[in-house]
Amino acid sequence: MREPRHVPQLRASGRRFPQRGRRHRFGKRNDAMSWSDRLVSRFNGARDAGGGAAPRTAARAASGARAAAGGLASVVNGARPTRSRMLDFDYSLLWVSIALLGLGVVMVYSASIAMPDSPKYASYHDYAFLLRHCVSLVVAFVAAVIAFRVPVSTWDKYAPHLFLIALVGLVIVLIPHIGKGVNGARRWIPLGITNMQPSEIMKLAVTIYAANYTVRKQEYMQSFAKGFLPMAFAVGLVGALLLLEPDMGAFMVVAAIAMGVLFLGGVNGKLFGGLVATAVGTFTMLVWLSPWRRERIFAYLDPWDERYAQGKAYQLTHSLIAFGRGEWFGVGLGGSVEKLNYLPEAHTDFILAVIGEELGFVGVLVVILLFYWIVRRSFEIGRQALALDRTFAGLMAKGVGIWFGAQAFINMGVNLGLLPTKGLTLPLVSYGGSGILLNCISLAVLLRVDYENRVLMRGGKV
């Protein structure tokens, strides 16, 4: 005969202990209680009778409710996307730009420290050019902060107006007694404490206007009369005004920006090829018809010839000597000999030669890599904007990259003897108020494009 199963004794509360492993109604297993807790519960069972059972039940209910609420909250929080750690804009681009600006401050001071020894600057202090350069940097920083706060849509809206303002500036600089001439070129408008160079404004204006034009005329990009010809006329007009200064270097940069943006905007391939051929033919004709430009080409081809070494090729020969003295690691910061009134414009057009002499091949290579990074990031930001269907922003960003790439390439080519001498500064590095100002504004516009890209990718609005 089978023995009866053992039935647990009832406690004073009238309740049985749940069986081991049985799930509690609030989702908690009874065996999760430690042995000491169970022992205390057995001894205090009688005390729980009557009024003691209700508080304990309420406490358990509250604990279970809190657990359920916590679980629900964790489920909801798990379904919610985590906060984005995306930066507001590309800080690597910002720091590379700051590095070039900082290098420019050091090298401008080094390259200009001996200039007061010449009769032309005898009244200047040793740090006069450094002080002016630092003031230009402060003004450029303030302008860049303001430009960064301007939405890209505003630049798009007022692009034609900015182009017209820059065009008027190119006309004003040619008016006698208004435009300031230096070394036979009339490129500056005196503004009291500083000089403004309208060609620098035109570089930014044509970058923005070319992007705006390409977007407005997108359906006519395959047409010669409606798509290609109006922009070609605008660039030709700008080129004519720049050549009257004369400023061939600025014209080459402006033409490169306009042609590059049109090409990236989808202009007809045959029309673009015709534009390139026309530009090359125009430059060739200008060189051939101008005796002094022709002499400069001959001097570039053979700078060590006795006829040119002390004349048209004087800057080039001393620039090459500076690079030769620098070798791999340079003669040391401040140790340049060519800047001691041997190399003209050492703090502006030929500052790379001073960098090569004092910091050597390694220093020049670092400068090249920094500019490469700016150009690369410009195109990446532009491509990202195009992927977000922001055609104007994308073309404008790439236009900034073309601007910096073309001007840096021409300046470096001139310093290294790869290109004929042109009056172009090295962006962000060379001494100059207008150049530094417009370079910083253009980088601020580029960072604004990147900022808006990131806002849109986070699901925001601009």
Swiss-Prot record:
Its main location: membrane. Keywords: Cell cycle, Cell division, Cell inner membrane, Cell membrane, Cell shape, Cell wall biogenesis/degradation, Glycosyltransferase, Membrane, Peptidoglycan synthesis, Transferase, Transmembrane, Transmembrane helix. It is found in: Cell inner membrane. Its EC number is 2.4.99.28. Residues 1-28 are annotated as: Disordered. Residues 114-127, 180-192, 245-247, 292-349, 420-425 are periplasmic. InterPro entries: FtsW (IPR013437), FtsW/RodA (IPR001182). It catalyses: [GlcNAc-(1->4)-Mur2Ac(oyl-L-Ala-gamma-D-Glu-L-Lys-D-Ala-D-Ala)](n)-di-trans,octa-cis-undecaprenyl diphosphate + beta-D-GlcNAc-(1->4)-Mur2Ac(oyl-L-Ala-gamma-D-Glu-L-Lys-D-Ala-D-Ala)-di-trans,octa-cis-undecaprenyl diphosphate = [GlcNAc-(1->4)-Mur2Ac(oyl-L-Ala-gamma-D-Glu-L-Lys-D-Ala-D-Ala)](n+1)-di-trans,octa-cis-undecaprenyl diphosphate + di-trans,octa-cis-undecaprenyl diphosphate + H(+). GO terms for biological process: cell wall organization; FtsZ-dependent cytokinesis; peptidoglycan biosynthetic process; regulation of cell shape. Residues 13-27 have a biased composition (Basic residues). PANTHER family: CELL CYCLE PROTEIN (PTHR30474), PEPTIDOGLYCAN GLYCOSYLTRANSFERASE FTSW-RELATED (PTHR30474:SF2). Belongs to the SEDS family. FtsW subfamily. This is Probable peptidoglycan glycosyltransferase FtsW. It comes from Burkholderia thailandensis (strain ATCC 700388 / DSM 13276 / CCUG 48851 / CIP 106301 / E264). The gene is ftsW.
